[in-house]
């Protein structure tokens, strides 16, 4: 929402944030957060590092998805709200966001599935025993059953993605406007 703000410094700051974190691979950012931040005195446990990395990257994509949903709104809707005397926040909360959120259900579902899949990068830091891919890797190391264990992990990721996509379709049908 701040990317459409009438305050230029806010727009610029959020645009810079989105452009920066949208273009950094999750793995590169995770390595930076885990290994480079302690070099400058910022020490964070591994689990919060993975969560922080996923939040930084996925929130930049969510901002862009929402901006796309906002851009899909007919400008006449906003002009009508202005003519009724609504302030910027009134327009955003009463007119823009309800329509924009309706427009971005599927892109947000896709983003959520992507975040679930990207969480597998957590296996690359000592968080490995708490994350599915890391657990499978440990089982593979101790029992030498690489293909079956990674196949099962892949099936878990596919099943999770299908459940999320199904919930997304239900939500999309619920918020759909029939014309």
What are these regions (language model features)?
Residues 1-179:
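Transmembrane alpha-helices and adjacent helix-loop boundaries
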């Amino acid at each position: 929402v701040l990317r459409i703000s009438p305050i230029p410094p806010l727009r610029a700051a959020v645009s810079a944030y989105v452009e920066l974190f949208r273009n950094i691979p999750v793995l590169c950012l995770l390595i930076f957060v885990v290994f480079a931040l302690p070099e400058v005195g910022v020490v964070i446990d591994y689990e919060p590092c993975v969560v922080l990395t996923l939040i930084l990257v996925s929130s930049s994509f969510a901002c862009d998805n929402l901006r796309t949903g906002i851009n899909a709104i007919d400008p006449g809707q906003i002009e009508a709200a202005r003519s009724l005397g609504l302030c910027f926040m009134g327009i955003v909360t009463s007119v823009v966001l309800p329509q924009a959120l309706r427009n971005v259900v599927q892109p947000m579902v896709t983003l959520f599935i992507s975040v679930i899949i990207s969480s597998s990068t957590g296996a690359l830091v000592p968080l490995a025993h708490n994350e599915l891919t890391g657990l499978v890797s440990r089982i593979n190391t101790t029992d030498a059953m690489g293909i079956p264990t990674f196949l099962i992990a892949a099936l878990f990721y596919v099943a999770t993605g299908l459940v999320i996509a199904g919930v997304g379709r239900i939500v999309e049908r619920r918020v759909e406007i029939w014309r």
